[in-house]
Amino acid sequence: MLVEYAFLPGIDKQSSDAGAENRWIDSDNVRFRYGLPEKVGGWSSLVTSTMVGVARAMHAFTDLSGNRYVAIGTDKFLLIYFEGQLHDVTPLKATLTSATIATTNGSPTCTITKAAHGLAVGDIVQLDSVTLPGGTGFNNADFEDKNFQVISVPTTGTFTINQASNASGTVSTGGSLSLKPYEPVGPRAQTYGYGWGVASYGNGNWGEAAAASDVSLEPGLWSLDNFGEVLIATIANGKTFTWNGGAATPLTNRASTATSNFQTTNNPTASRITLVSPTTRHLIHLATETTIGTTTTQDDMFIRFSDQEGINTYAPTATNTAGTQRLQDGTKIMGALKAKETILIWTDNALYTMKFVGAPFTFGFEQVGTNCGLIGKNAAVEIDGIAYWMSPKGFFAFDGTVKSLPCTVEDHVFENIDTTKGQQITAGLNNLFTEVIWYYPSANSEYNDKYVVLNFGETALVKIPGGVWYTGTEARTSWVDATIYPKPFATKYDSTATGTFPAIVGESGLGQTTLFEHEVGTDQVNPNGTTTAVTSFIKSFDIDLESRQRGQREKLAGETFLALRRFVPDFKSLQGNAKVTLGVKRYPQDTQVTTALSPFTITSSTLKKDTRARGRFLNIKIENDTASESWRYGTLRLDVQPDGRR
């Protein structure tokens, strides 16, 4: 008897394998579209180079001539992607002159001496005006206009760098060079802090480490937005810089606080987040200084906004619209998004709206939710006035009121997430497929390695209790949806590899980020042009003989064995091959046995597959594991018969 089994879209991990009636229970690199599961599209590297460090933010914008830019903020650099190339526009600190250098024969380590250099381990510094002392074995060109990573800081007046080769002579100190330090951004990973500052003075014995800590050392983050054709870039808990995409030769310029006509020299010098108001063009600083220029006055709940159209004017007067506001519910502002004519502001406990109301207050603030705080700065997205976000307590949406979202994969996500790394979580919108994607670090991972998706379009279409959710293991650290470019862009970080741009001599342990264009082809195309298969799979719940009859009469719940004789494939589309595995069990918690002859290799011309299997429960797994394969599955058709009770 040929029987058809229909499945609801989405993954159900809240139920047991047998209890998730008519549901899929596991997947990777699979999405749902009009109720049917399909492999996701591939992704292709946009450039042949890889970025040094881990990207945490992207922002797409255009200049007035229509040139398209994507700003990318990493833990080391601020980069611009422009039509197939990356450009370094990272702001520099003040140049330090009259430094000297020392080398040791047979070692790549060079010691640079400069009083009060202010550099820390991991900082990037560019060397300029280099005149080496004799006897080092190096040439001036080995250092001139080259970037180096600070390897160690023995004293406040010395630091070390590594050359690409060993020195052939020992020179105690000499020569002359200038230092151009890059503005530091922050660590590449979020950690709990230990040591000085993690507890109150006098807590514990001298020299004794704290057993635990609730002090989180946040990763290097950026706020990226545009003021027309001008990029506004703020380092988290640091300064704000601008880069003018409309300048005569913009890609030769660096972001700066002194950009002509767009200075930020009067801006706060320590802000967690910045953005530009969508209709009034105020530059808003969140979790910023109560006294501009004094970083010790940074208040994690304090907001400061500029004069309208005046991104460098913050002193309120009777004739401007600059001002301030302090929020109350929470301990720190975590994130903010523009939603039509409203700005949404999350603390670690609450949600506020910020709306333009005119004189005398300029903006009005209203608390619209509590116990719904944001888990990390980049863990929220907005589409057409509706915001979706991840909280330490679950998933939420705001469409005028805050709603807690039921989630059929909730335990799978929140029981295996490293909540101490919330600032590494990034949310992305893939509007073409009505998907909100959260990439997050699992409990045993230093970096993002898993994802969870809410398909808000499918949820509205099918109206399934709990919504249409699915999960997987692909890792991304930042995302920008198709706006000025026709496809989404995303970044992937590899901590074990070495980035190639910007070039850093003697680089060690910074990792690399690849910039991908998504929904392209079927595979992963790497920066060197090689192809890696994007594997995918989906697995069903444990079907019993009467699964399809639920609601028609009292269900016998696996009382009767089923005998399987034939599988009839029904793929809506199939490129290359798909692999289908049928598994059977005698009991829900029994070990699965693969049916005879499976896994089956299915092509577009496969009409049926004969097999033999017997059990109370049966499931199907559809997957692909080689390149140039893609599939979309329809309905499950099996030839099954009742086969007794033992």
Task: Indicate residue ranges for each PLM-predicted region.
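Conserved beta-strand element within WD40/beta-propeller blades
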Residues: 70-73, 232-234, 285, 344-345, ...
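Short linear, low-complexity motifs centered on an aromatic residue
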Residues: 240-259, 579-588
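Beta-sheet repeat architectures centered on beta-propellers
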Residues: 1-94, 185-192, 201, 221-223, ...
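Small/polar beta-strand repeat architecture
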Residues: 1, 89-220, 249-253, 262-266
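Hydrophobic or amphipathic alpha-helical targeting/insertion segments
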Residues: 229-243
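Beta-propeller and closely related beta-pinwheel folds
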Residues: 42-62, 90-94, 204-217, 249-425
